[in-house]
Amino acid sequence: MSKLQDRHGGEAAADVGRRARHQRLLLSFPVFPIVLLLLAPCTIFFFTSGDVPLPRIRIEYARRDAPTITAVAADTSPPPPSPPSSSPPPLSFPPPPPPPSSPPPPALPVVDDHSDTQRSLRRLRQLTDSPYTLGPAVTGYDARRAEWLRDHTEFPASVGRGRPRVLMVTGSAPRRCKDPEGDHLLLRALKNKVDYCRVHGFDIFYSNTVLDAEMSGFWTKLPLLRALMLAHPETELLWWVDSDVVFTDMLFEPPWGRYRRHNLVIHGWDGAVYGAKTWLGLNAGSFIIRNCQWSLDLLDAWAPMGPPGPVRDMYGKIFAETLTNRPPYEADDQSALVFLLVTQRHRWGAKVFLENSYNLHGFWADIVDRYEEMRRQWRHPGLGDDRWPLITHFVGCKPCGGDDASYDGERCRRGMDRAFNFADDQILELYGFAHESLDTMAVRRVRNDTGRPLDADNQELGRLLHPTFKARKKKTSRAARPM
């Protein structure tokens, strides 16, 4: 019995040993590499085949409110046949188009904040809406400004006897010019105004920002002037000049004493404004306005006619009915000012000075070809009138370009270059130079100051270089007197 158990037990042990050896042989055989070798081509074919639909991931950037990542089912339709190629197919493909049942929302146009497209997207003020305002009404301004000036004596409203503190205000559009030469012309126009302000001791503020979308175009000046008045109580007078204004008499300065009792000085004629009621009876491209309550009230009465759309269109028709020879196009700031003076003369007329004794506005077409004659006949600036105009205004010329120019662009550019050179010569001559002619940018030496640079033979040049208002008053004391 024990032998039988030993024999069967030995056989069982032998079977166990044989199975263990078989398992070791299986484990030692390279099964996994062979399986990988067989499956790899199948896997590559499976993933690269265009006939197998797979889920895809598409990233959309169309709109801010669209989901950032969207899972889209693959298109089950067969792809269009591709031309044969000797190169192997790429391993990745662009995501398929979205299914027709759920197209992505259209993207909103990306436009400039001040472009015509963006303005068209804004809601225009309707006639049934409340009238436009520049801001909260300002009351008691004169008393508050006087108190501020008393508390800040270091910022007087007068910079000398009979000379008020003047801030010249100008600007241009926020975008680059359509005409490639336009930005250069605007730069020269700014340089011209800076020269004039430096000679006369004026401050200058240049804006290329639309402060309020409803006050665009010609109307941009109104919110700007109001903001500067409130921010600079030390400024007595603000002088607005359009970007196409060129100062051509660098010595002449307005007679400030003449305007002590007036708050608005603008080029015009009483008969043309109050009599003929013509919208061309004054020019709003250059005017001087006092920093006071009256002026703030005028701006508040002026601005509601300026919002684009139905409001401008309505007032344009009203101006055409009220003013002489005024076409019925949309309202402009100049016609609006004439309309206020004509219909509310009792309120505004007494404080408005319509100036025509000198050229606070001079029409360029009548001036630019006479500069050489002015030099020969009058020899030096300081007159300010038609003999030697203070301002040459390029009305109807669009230095920045555009389809609404009234005059030929080449003619305007030639006239502006002549005006800039004519004015610039009055500055260059202070240092002994001048342009070879008004039609060229080349300069030449006209005076040799190397030997006697401090000579003051030319009194007019001395007035420009060293005006009396910039000089300190002489003070004498007993200690300084000779014994």
Swiss-Prot record:
Topology Lumenal: residue spans: 48-483
Membrane topology: Single-pass type II membrane protein
Superkingdom: Eukaryota
Pro residues bias spans: 77-108
Location (main, coarse): Golgi
Protein's cellular compartments: Golgi apparatus membrane
Top enzyme class: transferase
Region listing for Disordered, in residue ranges: 71-119
The keyword Ion transport is assigned to this record: no
Keyword line: Glycoprotein, Glycosyltransferase, Golgi apparatus, Membrane, Signal-anchor, Transferase, Transmembrane, Transmembrane helix
Protein name: Probable glycosyltransferase 4
Taxon lineage: Eukaryota, Viridiplantae, Streptophyta, Embryophyta, Tracheophyta
Gene designation per UniProt: GT4
